[in-house]
Amino acid sequence: MSFVRRYGDPVLKSKATPVDRFDDTLRGQVARMAGIMSDAFGVGLAAPQLGISQRLLVYRVGQEAPVIALVNPEVEWTGEDEEGWEEGCLSIPGVQVDVDRPVHVRVRARDEQGDERLVEASGLEARVIQHEIDHLDGVLILDRTSKEQRKEAIRALREMESADEEAA
């Protein structure tokens, strides 16, 4: 997706600012993000991935599930159990790395209407929420994986960039 910012863009390494207006503009942004996420076959998308420094994310775990927007999310609690899974990212296309994350999470946020929302999630949903909140804090999956996997991923990204430049 040409809208999604790629690895190396400074906005992806910056902490996003809180949302303070819950209006039609925000609701339009949520709808746009949901559409881009779906078009890219993603399960989550954070505003910084579109170059927007706002603490806003959308996610959907399962094709039949509704899209959920979390505005200004804050992790209240994570379970002690962690699990390693291979994660990918729309901002780092073609790369998947192992990331350890808590299996359970509780997050307090607001929805796009401004209503308070408490989300208790496990498994894939918990992982997606934590991944997207990382984006709001300027953290990427390459920051959460092993040094070896990070090196290999960066090498693969450089090779893809070189191939793209040669094709152009």
Give residue ranges: language-model regions:
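Positively charged
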Residues: 1-168
